[in-house]
Amino acid sequence: MYGEGESEPVPEQVAQFAQEAYQLHMMECLLTVMPRLEFEARKDIVQIFVALLQRSIGSRRPTVEYVWTHPAILRMAIRGYDVPDIALNTGIILHEMLQYELLAKLFLYSDDLYRFPQYIETTSFSISCDAFKNLRDALLCHRSIAAEFLNMHYDRFFHMYTQLLDSQNYVTRRQSLKLLGELLVDRAHYATMIRYVSDEENLKRIMNALRDRSKHIQLEAFHVFKVFVANPKKTPAVESILRRNRSRLLTFLQGFLPDRTGMLAMAHPSFTSHYSHTHTRACILIGAAFSLCCTHSFACFFFFFSQTNHSLTSASISSTSLGTCTMPDGARVNALVHSAMPSTS
């Protein structure tokens, strides 16, 4: 599959090997015997899977098509997380499968998707991280497939995902909040976002996360919370909660916003790679202030869905996109934050 020494593999031999692998159901057999093999042999199996999956004939991926018609292979790769000795090996195989839209769809619509809270919560740190990474890839790498899936299976998926958001494990909670924030501000997930931020129970959960002792969890929760506030068509229940808690939220946010620049830089180093510290801080404050300003809801939505990758430039935060306000000083920021919540009157 990889050639011998420095020589390239012979295409005819690779094709013959692949055909025999399909005919003999070798992929299923290798996953079955993997727990009984030595460490180096497991690594060899991973290389075989990766090579087969990457093999192409023109625009076709024969092995991807084969796995699509033999879903037990994907199921076995997922359930490798049940066996600690091979979990990271099968995790690599699953990761390679999820690079292809067809198999990502097979993964999302599989009942085995709902085993992932167990894999993330009850396994070792390395296995938990690997399982979460594969779940994240499935939701983010193929946006149209994921959006269609979430629209069709919203209730079942978020019933599962709430388990991760409510986890007692710091890493699980932080990464789950971060992924949720990424999903909600992605244009492909607009319908899911509207449905999520219309539910008052979701708002309560995120507001509780804002009170977490961890500043990093507070930060990730804030990125989700501001989507609730920015929604121009809040449900009565959501608006009522924001109205009742307006004073406490404003007090919290006035102290929360100014000192988050350094934390954001540590969490997302690429954000500051092309901007000065002063410019970055101003951008964060502008984004936060406008995303909380109910009187600028549509400007805020423009900001969210055009800047999801934080690619901020002076043009993208002009008065055209954000109303009449320009770079705010501290007083201006406080005034904008103060207008964040619905009036209590």
Q: What is each PLM-predicted segment?
A:
Residues 1-118, 132-151, 189-195, 202-205, ...:
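Alpha-helical solenoid scaffolds in large eukaryotic transport, assembly, and signaling factors
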Residues 37, 82, 123, 164, ...:
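Structural signature of alpha-solenoid helical repeat scaffolds
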Residues 45, 276-284, 293-305:
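Intrinsically disordered, low-complexity terminal segments enriched in Ser/Thr
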Residues 162-234:
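Long, repeat-rich segments with strong aromatic
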